Amino acid sequence: MATISIGAEKPNVVVIMADDLGYADLSFLDDAPADIKKIGTPNLDRLANEGTYFSASYATAPICSPARTGFITGRYQTRWGNYWYGQGGLPTSELTIPKALKKLGYATKKIGKTHHNGGKAQHPLKHGFDEFLGFIHHTWDYTRLSSKDRDAYKKAGKGKSLGILCVGPLERNNGEKVSLEDAFTTEVFTDEACAYISQDHGDKPFYLQLAYNAMHMPTYVVDQDYAKKVGLPPEPWDREAASWTFPYFDPRNGPWAAWHKQWGHLGKVDPLGRKRYLSHLMAMDDGIGKIMDTLKAKGLRDNTLIVFLSDNGGTINTYANNGSLRGYKYMFGEGGIRIPIIVSMPSKLPANQQKSTIVSSMDLFPTIMNLAGGKVPENLDGKSLLPVLRNQPSGQRHHDTLVWDKGKGGCWVVRHGKWKLAHNAGWTHSDYEFKNGEAVAVDAPFTYPDGIQLFDLEDDPRETTNLADQHPETVAELTKLHTAWRSQMSKPGRPKN
């Protein structure tokens, strides 16, 4: 692919990734839920107004680890066997966005969550980042960030289940522990980002990738300043007593798996769960505002590309709202794989646009390379968004086909134009509704159909009417597309490096 000329000065790049953000939880959307309209997401609204919001953008998987590796490589992570949890990992042989930008003279930093799910080889410093502050696990506690918190858990839990609890100090660079008391990850990560933007990078442009853990579980750990804003009651914390009350996991009351089955799958509903979620969303939005303000104060905003996205769809266990989309994280329903993407660069790209073009998080790698003046690798599955962003004729039809696959059980999905074919993608779980602002369980579970399902997403975006019997030729066509795609992918499994 040819390099697109954009001028001599390389832009700075800031990528901000939310965790499990509900598709509808942005207040600039016409159909945003009432509670979002009330609290607002003013800084994400501002970013969208300064750029382009994509309403038909997709993650490469409905879960964290595979989706994150698909984004950072611009490729289907299934090419090296990363379909689902337990199959994860990012080979060091894969070219990533920061690796490619370093070759163009960029300084690079990663802040926040990593979760490439493959051990020490997945550390950010092994994949193109010069600096790192955050954690490499699937989750981390929002406020229990000190060695004292870790010790309290060890004492209360007698050493059990500590590997998955993810409590205690953060990590800086290659192993340095950062123990923080009276801290809140969203603010820690925001301050670190602002400090990096403000420092002297010499003649180097910078690439900053900030991955908030908001709004991933455990959202029930809330910064008290934000708790007050959404009407949550005070929840004092006694570190020495190590008293964890529902919905917090208590290691003395049984194993993590049993707790997660109950809480994580809504076997027991947290009435205040949505308010907890909203408090974290408010904190993240404030952080994004501080980052935008810092860029402006330093005279960098016009020449800085800001990208905002979520890793995957919103999840029911943190009470995210996916609006009219069916399904949640973990599912191949639109609510599991469709995500918001916002792209903004005042000096180079149009502002105040909303696009319904079908795009993917994989497209961000080639887009960044084009704007940085680099050559786009030929083996990427993503396509540059510049023709779409600049309203060029070639951008009217971006991706003809996108594919998702669980790697087992014949569970896969193909989107081709207006059509979506789902094969053995069924999912059933508990559900809830809101009464007087609190979550309550409902008798009927949420069900996404199994078997062969064909949906016309233009006429039926909620995926309610199966048209497979009426359009057997379309079912056959999309099945062939999946077969051809799968033949290019690896078998499920961990990479050798």
Model-identified regions with their sequence ranges:
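Active-site environment of divalent metal-dependent phosphoester hydrolases
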Residues: H116-K120, T315
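Active-site segment of extracytoplasmic enzymes that catalyze sulfate/phosphate-ester chemistry
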Residues: V15, Y23-K110, G119-K120, P124-F132, ...
